[in-house]
Amino acid sequence: MASMNVKKGDRVVVLAGKDKGKKGEVIAAMPSEQRVIVQGVNLVKRHTRPSATSQGGIVEKEASIHVSNVAHEDPKDGKATRIGHKILEDGRKVRVARRSGEVIDR
């Protein structure tokens, strides 16, 4: 299985589905399932039972979406971009936005 270009903490744009066009930060990445959880995107309602620790009721939380439905947000203009890799002079391998050439890795 191919590795994912999306990591926890990346800013992404949703390309398809009911939340198309929304932007958010990746909360969790699941490489084995090729899925990501994006903050504020794909919200679902969970009906939870009361327990000793939690009150219970209807809780709204983010569900995962497939990685093919998101793209990185270009640091320059905020639009969706593809990702390339580049080796810097100091030997570090970094991810770069194909749209602007801007380095995405922190």
From Swiss-Prot:
GO cellular component terms, semicolon-separated: ribonucleoprotein complex; ribosome
GO molecular-function term, one example from the UniProt record: structural constituent of ribosome
Keywords: Ribonucleoprotein, Ribosomal protein, RNA-binding, rRNA-binding
Protein name, entry field: Large ribosomal subunit protein uL24
Keyword RNA-binding: yes
Known function: One of two assembly initiator proteins, it binds directly to the 5'-end of the 23S rRNA, where it nucleates assembly of the 50S subunit.
Listed Pfam families: KOW (PF00467), ribosomal_L24 (PF17136)
Family: Belongs to the universal ribosomal protein uL24 family.
Entry-linked InterPro entries: KOW, Rib_uL2_dom2, Ribosomal_uL24, Ribosomal_uL24_CS, Ribosomal_uL24_KOW, Translation_prot_SH3-like_sf
Subunit structure: Part of the 50S ribosomal subunit.
Organism annotation: Paramagnetospirillum magneticum (strain ATCC 700264 / AMB-1) (Magnetospirillum magneticum)
A Gene Ontology biological process term: translation
